[in-house]
UniProtKB/Swiss-Prot annotation:
The lineage of its organism: Eukaryota, Metazoa, Ecdysozoa, Nematoda, Chromadorea. Pfam families: DEXQc_Suv3 (PF22527), Helicase_C (PF00271), SUV3_C (PF12513), Suv3_C_1 (PF18147), Suv3_N (PF18114). Residues 181-319 form the Helicase ATP-binding domain. It comes from Caenorhabditis elegans. Residues 343-499 form the Helicase C-terminal domain. This is ATP-dependent RNA helicase SUV3 homolog, mitochondrial. The keyword Nucleotide-binding applies. ATPase and DNA/RNA helicase able to unwind DNA/DNA, DNA/RNA and RNA/RNA duplexes in the 5'-3' direction.
Amino acid sequence: MRRASGVLRVLGGLTQRCSTSSTPSSSRFPAMNSRRKRNSVRKTATIEDIVEPRKVKHVTQTAAGMGEWIGSLDNTNIHMSLDEFMRRPMVRQLAKENGINDKLFMRSFKSFREYCTPEDLNSVDPGLLILLSDISKGTKDCEMLYPFFLDHAKQVFPHLEAMDDLRIISDLTRPHNWYPEARSVTRKIFFHAGPTNSGKTYHALKRFGEAKSAVFCGPLKLLAAEVFHRTNELGIPCDLVTGEERRFAKDNHHPSQHLSSTVEMLSTQMRVEVAVIDEIQMLRDEQRGWAWTRALLGAAADEIHLCGEPAAIDIVKKLLEPIGETVEVRYYERKSPLAIADKAIESYSNIEPGDCIVCFSKRSIFFNSKKLEENGIKPAVIYGDLPPGTKLAQAAKFNDPDDECNVLVATDAIGMGLNLNIRRVIFNSCTRQTELLPTYAALQIAGRAGRFGTAYANGVATTMRKEDLGTLKAILSEKIEPIANVGIAPTYDQIETFSFHLPQASFVRLLDLFVSVCSVSDHFFICTVYDMRELAVLIDQIPLPLKVRYTFCTSPLNTEDKRTSAVFVKMARRFSTGQALTYEWLIDMLEWPPKPATTLNELSLLEQNYEILDQYMWLSMRFPDMLPDEPRVREASKHLDSMIQEGVESFMSLLSVGATESKAAGSSKSSEGKRENPSKSEREKPNKRSSILEALLKRADISEDDLEQLREELNKNKK
């Protein structure tokens, strides 16, 4: 067993056919969301670093008239006795047995000494005074102070009183016991293993359609919606559940036997014949891996069909071993070949129909789109900030052989969830977050090249720059390491029970404390949730019930955007007053009606407004009485989606007007490399750049090889 070192991901949600967990990132953010890459850094803070000491008040009754008992006792005598007490090895040993390590001991001792030596000794507990007097006279040993010290330490650090209970509550080593419904079923597990474009999901979905009742769990809202539409088109009634939306094949009084959902929204109480869990390798994801682990262990189905990379096979078997479930693996080969080109593109004049330039920031999207336009090529554009409707519209334009947009510029948002007829995937860079792309991510992106049954059946992967091609070949040639451990998160009930023992702790403090004491087995890690904690800090001073605060803090909100964060705080504050969050109140903050985008900044503003409306719909799913105008907000959201589509259609004119508007190229919800699109704060962080050249690397479109060449040239000039 080991102590968890991440920041927990805990989510709450819906009842009935919806999951009891929320879905903060299922529908809009791709798995490789680099905005959150910073979250993958494991937290190392211990409970001793987190807890704050409480001031212990002196007794209200005084020790007046005790002169005959304490004699000439004064603060000097007391200091001598306490110093001797502190140095005793036995005292330290007893403290450790009661959960007081050296750090807590010194903090507790400092408070204890201050308590024992006030200006007026009459305010000290009489029993303690008598003992201190006896110790100073030599008739009692200083170690007899320990019971008083321990009692004081527990008042200074209340968690010490409940430490054993807190460890029991935060024990996450046996998550399979959390799902009694699933444990009551004799489940058959099928693993459909293969690369992109191998037909693994197709075969699993065939079984989904054949079953009398079934649930599909996808990684993205777009994919869940696609399964929803296709299933209904086949004449099989199917409902849809995502974090922001519920749709019924008939109506809410007649739920269908088939359900398509984002993976976070799976209800572990829903009994079905077949459950399909797509992209099972997402178990490894730092942010969302907990949802796949929960689905794997908690889906109450006779048959579980897993689809994903072979790298997940071993860990899936290990996770199911304690409950006696075995896995039948079915391997699939890629239906069309994927080749690595011998040459890089190098020039935009070499771009051809069916090409997709993959970037890792909005800045690079804008840069490459403008270069293509200068070469007479009108591209389709897809990046993470775009609403689903706009993404689908851009994908449709690119896929349409009669449309002039036969080239695509996209972030790695294309890695999953969109059907695209791509011939060549062109990597604009091989780095993301200033680090080389991991093999599994590069293969996921490269695998989008070539699509069985289309004009581009044979796929090709290459790079924009000649110097990156060797790097790409090396990355893609590496074997994907088997997944060693998977994400896990505690339940809301665990957090709530934890809070009962620490009633004075803020929600932020509860999160930190839970992580510092919880335990997980070697097959698991606690999913990080930097954004959840940031949201908790934003509304820390707003009075909200724990469940409400908890749900607000699991919202799928971009915490790096000050405007959306400010609206989030206003929503929480109005909620706390008991006032309904109405449509009129909401649009009043958004300067409604919106104006068509004529610059990149204005397009970015429309995207922010869309995210705010999306946030409203997400909260409305959980608090329909307090956010009653979901239908009107959804209509407004559709209107914004259309306006954003129009803005993207006139993308090139926006670029010409706003090419210098660097703010519009801010953080995107898709994976954005810091090298391609660093924020101002990142550029200014101390100790993060060792030279001006490395600063240029972060600000401009310069590769690592370019940087090395610059160094060599400067060295020659010096000589």
